[in-house]
Each structure stands twice: as structure tokens, then as C-alpha cells.
């Protein structure tokens, strides 16, 4: 099974990648560009072998940089020599949920199997912010698991979920169409709606 970690810069994605793969990783460049390619291997407690790809950080699939273009092409299966992932793990920073959910909604539109890794969930609790994970799952229509990339056991819930997940087979990304201004606005409005429902700030 191949999974790809998708997320914006500084969301804790690479820390989570290191936690999942340990020293079993290989670093190179994508062909034709000076963008780093990081892949590792996770062996789950149940013995499942998972190839983990740490995609370049991206704020949106509407690519504005070489890093974002590589990420978009890998996710959509358009990158030469790179098989499309079986599963997208969309890593979001729980303390900056608005930033991460935009990417989640963009990626969801392509119809690939997805799970959200809500990283830094411990930090958000320390701030007195309550996130209704079950409600978030319902609104996003995908599983949401809590992770803490800087803690030794911080990926245990994600690994447990991966152990129980089985690819449906035949899943292919829909063709990616860059969002126009109206679609970007619609996505932003949907993110705000979900946040109003799922997040309770301290009084």
C-alpha cells in the first residue's frame, strides 16, 4: 500500500513522516526539478507494509510554486514515473484548522480515499479550544484521527486506523481543474461553516 502525506508547510507533516518511518527513508529529488522527494516504509503492528511519501508542503492544489506543482501532479497521478497513492493522509495543524481544511476540501473533490490527521491536537487542548472530531468527520465525510508529531506515541491512532483500512481498489483521481475565484470563495465559505459547527473557542 502507498500513502501520501499532504499538508501545508509547518503543519507537522514531516515530523509525522519521521515518526511513522523512523530511519527507513530515502531522500532524492524529483526528476527534472530541485524539489526533494522523501519516501519511507512503515511496518504496522499487524505486519502491514506501507510505503509513505512525504509530499512537498502546499497551501493549495492551485499550484503557485514548483513544490505545489509537484504535489498536485503526484496527488492527481500526473507525475511521470510516480504512481498515484492509494490513500491521502491530509495533515492539518489543529491550531490553524482553517488553513488546513481548504486543502482537505480541494483534495476531497478528486474522490480519492482520504483520512485527516489532526496534528498538534494536544496544543489545541492546552489553548482551551474544543474540536468536535466526530462532527468534523461527518461534515468532511472522511475519518479524522488525532496525532502529535513530536511525541513518540503521537501517531498510534493513525497507525491503528491504517491497520484496519483496506483499499477499495480501482480508485482514481478525477481530473484536477484549477479553481476559479467563485470556487475559491465557495471553498472558503464552506471552511468557515464547518469551523463554526466543529470548533468551540474558550469563553
Regions found by a protein language model. Give the residues of each.
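Conserved G1/Walker A P-loop phosphate-binding module
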Residues: 1-66, 78, 82, 87
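Hydrophobic alpha-helical scaffolding
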Residues: 61, 93, 148, 177-184
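Canonical P-loop GTPase G-domain recognition
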Residues: 122-176
Amino acid at each position: 500500500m502507498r500513502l501520501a502525506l499532504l499538508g501545508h508547510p509547518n503543519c507537522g507533516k514531516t515530523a509525522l513522516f519521521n515518526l511513522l518511518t523512523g530511519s527507513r527513508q530515502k531522500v532524492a529529488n524529483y526528476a527534472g526539478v530541485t524539489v526533494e522527494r522523501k519516501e519511507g516504509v512503515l511496518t504496522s503492528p499487524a505486519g502491514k507494509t506501507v510505503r509513505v511519501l512525504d509530499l512537498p508542503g502546499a497551501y493549495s492544489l492551485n499550484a503557485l510554486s514548483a513544490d505545489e506543482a509537484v504535489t498536485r501532479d503526484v496527488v492527481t497521478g500526473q507525475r511521470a514515473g510516480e504512481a498515484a497513492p492509494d490513500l491521502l493522509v491530509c495533515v492539518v495543524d489543529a491550531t490553524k484548522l482553517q488553513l488546513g481544511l481548504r486543502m482537505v476540501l480541494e483534495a476531497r473533490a478528486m474522490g480519492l480515499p482520504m483520512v485527516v490527521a489532526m496534528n498538534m491536537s494536544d496544543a489545541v487542548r492546552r489553548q482551551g479550544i474544543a474540536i468536535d472530531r466526530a462532527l468534523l468527520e461527518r461534515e468532511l465525510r472522511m475519518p479524522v484521527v488525532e496525532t502529535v508529531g513530536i511525541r513518540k506515541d503521537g501517531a498510534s491512532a493513525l497507525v491503528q486506523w491504517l491497520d484496519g483500512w483496506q483499499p477499495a481498489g480501482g480508485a482514481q483521481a478525477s481530473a484536477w481543474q484549477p479553481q476559479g475565484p467563485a470556487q475559491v470563495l465557495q471553498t472558503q465559505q464552506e471552511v468557515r461553516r464547518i469551523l463554526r459547527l466543529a470548533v468551540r473557542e474558550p469563553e
